[in-house]
Amino acid sequence: MDQTLSDFGTVFVFLLLGIIFVVGGYLTARLLRPSRPNPEKLAIYECGEEAVGSAWVKFNIRFYVVALIFIIFDVEVVFLFPWATVFKQLGEFALIEALVFAGILVIGLVYAWVKGDLDWVRPTPNIPKMPVLEEDESQVVS
């Protein structure tokens, strides 16, 4: 029990010192730097060029899907690294668990692939045009 509290105490002290350094650096910079705002300093900076248009641009949804898939597999790697370090001590059951975990993610990847979310340039659907039938006036019920 004492060892656990000691470990948590170490983490707490580390976290507290990190917060103190960040806040201290921010406050020191804020107090020491000169503050002389002018329109040129407050303008949007785009690689030294004048800003053209609005900065609020709609991005294609494909960027979002690719980012989500990247994050999912990035988190998978985060979960598999600790497992890989103690692989020999865990035995076959842990291997089966890791394979099931990776298999579920591969099924999700295949689903996204089949759905077409990984295709950057999507083909336009080819919808056949139906012929227009002319109505026979003799069959129209009045």
UniProtKB/Swiss-Prot annotation:
Pfam family, one: Oxidored_q4
Keywords: Cell inner membrane, Cell membrane, Membrane, NAD, Quinone, Translocase, Transmembrane, Transmembrane helix, Transport
GO terms, molecular function: NADH dehydrogenase (ubiquinone) activity; NADH:ubiquinone reductase (non-electrogenic) activity; quinone binding
Membrane topology category: Multi-pass membrane protein
Reactions that this protein is recorded to catalyse: a quinone + NADH + 5 H(+)(in) = a quinol + NAD(+) + 4 H(+)(out)
Top EC group: translocase
A GO cellular-component term linked to this record: plasma membrane
TM regions (residue ranges): 8-28, 63-83, 93-113
Assigned EC number: 7.1.1.-
Subcellular localization, as worded in the UniProt entry: Cell inner membrane
Classification via PANTHER family: NADH-UBIQUINONE OXIDOREDUCTASE CHAIN 3
Main function: NDH-1 shuttles electrons from NADH, via FMN and iron-sulfur (Fe-S) centers, to quinones in the respiratory chain. The immediate electron acceptor for the enzyme in this species is believed to be a menaquinone. Couples the redox reaction to proton translocation (for every two electrons transferred, four hydrogen ions are translocated across the cytoplasmic membrane), and thus conserves the redox energy in a proton gradient.
Record text on subunit structure and interactions: NDH-1 is composed of 14 different subunits. Subunits NuoA, H, J, K, L, M, N constitute the membrane sector of the complex.
Similarity-based family: Belongs to the complex I subunit 3 family.
Protein name: NADH-quinone oxidoreductase subunit A
Organism: Chlorobium phaeobacteroides (strain BS1)
